[in-house]
Amino acid sequence: MAPALLLVPAALASFILAFGTGVEFVRFTSLRPLLGGIPESGGPDARHGWLAALQDRSILASLAWDLCLLLLFVVQHSLMATEAVKAWTSRYFGVLQRSLYVACTALALQLVMRYWETTPRGPVLWEARAEPWATWVPLLCFVLHVVSWLLIFSILLVFDYAELMGLKQVYYHVLGLGEPLSLKSPRALRLFSHLRHPVCVELLTVLWVVPTLGTDRLLLALLFTLYLGLAHGLDQQDLRYLRSQLQRKLHLLSRPQDGEAE
């Protein structure tokens, strides 16, 4: 195992890469379609209908390329999460296993965003162009995106994302505290195994709630919706555990502070 002098910078580098990728993902999924950094459609006169789009090789080529990028991300994200690959990476990278997974995921997502091809001449599923929709729909989408991202960031702070990002493993290793997950209750471990992406609803809101839903955005939203749906498997035991934890936290928050009960 590498000395702590190398472990800490490696874990921090992975975290910084993931953080920068997250910022870029906000731009890619929200700022671009809402603020028009890169147009997602070329106007009603420049676009094909759905049947004509199926015969346009340039549109089909762009969608096929985007699909390959998304599949690359999905395969990487899923394959490296399997027990066999985790055992192999743990054997050779030790406590940096999670940091390696996070870094590879960030790089795969960077490839998706950097080489994504839009389809400005493709058809749209919906578009807010006529007034008053052209004014109010983008504003409503902007508000929902802001709320969704605030919820996502809040959940990241409340959820044990230091462990999910790989920082906690290195921190505990340097201090000789062992594996962070070994200190969690069996019910918490069971929940973590079923819910490693605790921002599903908010992310789907960001993907689908846009003023103009073109073909490339539709492909992005559909594939991530399918992937997130298949990646989550909460059952009644998980829901009961979440409910009990929520009630416990609400009870702690509702308790009077010292001197307030007098």
From Swiss-Prot:
This is Nurim. Belongs to the nurim family. Residues 29-58, 115-133, 211-216 are perinuclear space. The chain crosses the membrane at residues 5-28, 59-80, 98-114, 134-164, 192-210, 217-234. Keywords: Membrane, Nucleus, Transmembrane, Transmembrane helix. GO terms for cellular component: nuclear envelope; nuclear inner membrane; nuclear lamina; nuclear membrane. PANTHER family: NURIM. InterPro entries: Nurim-like. Residues 1-4, 81-97, 165-191, 235-262 are nuclear. It is a multi-pass membrane protein. It is found in: Nucleus inner membrane. It comes from Mus musculus (Mouse).
